[in-house]
Amino acid sequence: MSRLAAASLLGADPTSLAPGTTVANTVSGQFDFPRAPVRWQARNVVGIVRGSDPALRTQYLSLSAHHDHVGFDHSPVDHDSLRAFNRVVRPMGADSPMRPATDDEWVRIRAILDSLRQVHRPRLDSIRNGADDDGSGTVAILEIAEAFARSATKPRRSVLFVSHTGEEAGLLGSRWYADHATVPIDSIVAEIDQDMIGRGTASDFPRGGTGAGSPTYLEVIGAKRISREFGEMLEAANARQPVPFVFDYTYDQPGHPLQYYCRADHYSYARYGIPSVAFSRGEHLDYHQVTDEAQYISYPDLARVAQMVHDGALAIANAPERPRRDVPKPTDPNAPCRQ
């Protein structure tokens, strides 16, 4: 409130009033707090570790994630009530159809909620934090970037690290970057995206697929669509891990109804004919919910994914030749995506 408005309201200069002063004025009025979206510039964040081979350092391997999420809810909800409901009715969070719970399901929901109430009181929340989607992938590329930067021996090719914005609004950041890349787009030899790599254990209520719900489960989208050699290099890097992941290609199948191939940032590069893959530990009950919080992340599993991606990236960056493309380069990068 301005000094002039305060003087009008109080009937005296507010600086002349002592604490506890009673004023005789009565003021009435109406006010409102309008809520409207504000345009704000979002940014991709790009870093480069330069390659060591003069003949190859102008080629780039891209590693990516996205740092945006889906905002907040206008009305807060109880954290534990939502988790209990989703655990029973919507095990894939926002990708599960919304429907009423049956009588039997309400019994299970109340039992889960009763057990949670013994631990803590109700907690209202409206912020969709996105700890897994995609805080997990963002953390991973930062750790991988630090490992490459600190290594005394740099990879032969250069490595791009791109944290995209606008993924949740339709791959806007990655599409913009691929269309206006900071390096020649044809110099990017491959793209590895990490999106939701911090969950996927049995307690997250898996919904099927090879090895789903185990510590070794990992969804792989797009790895062999453009270059089988690229996919095989990633499989070889995985096989060298102390505990290899079980790669699940279920959601990469042509025509799969969930359309994962078209929904992750790797596709923005694939439409230019760049061998591209998206790694994920899978969806869960907190997907696009206010309950996607850091407390539910499995940090050891996240670190294992990041290590495997690092090793695969290093192998590709050091290979004598870039991954060989098996299909023609698309003539129109703006053509509709086909799962």
Indicate where each model-derived feature is located.
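Soluble non-cytosolic domains of exported or imported proteins
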Residues: 4, 37-38, 122, 131-139, ...
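His/Asp/Glu-rich mid-to-C-terminal helical/loop segments that flank catalytic regions of hydrolases
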Residues: 280, 284-339
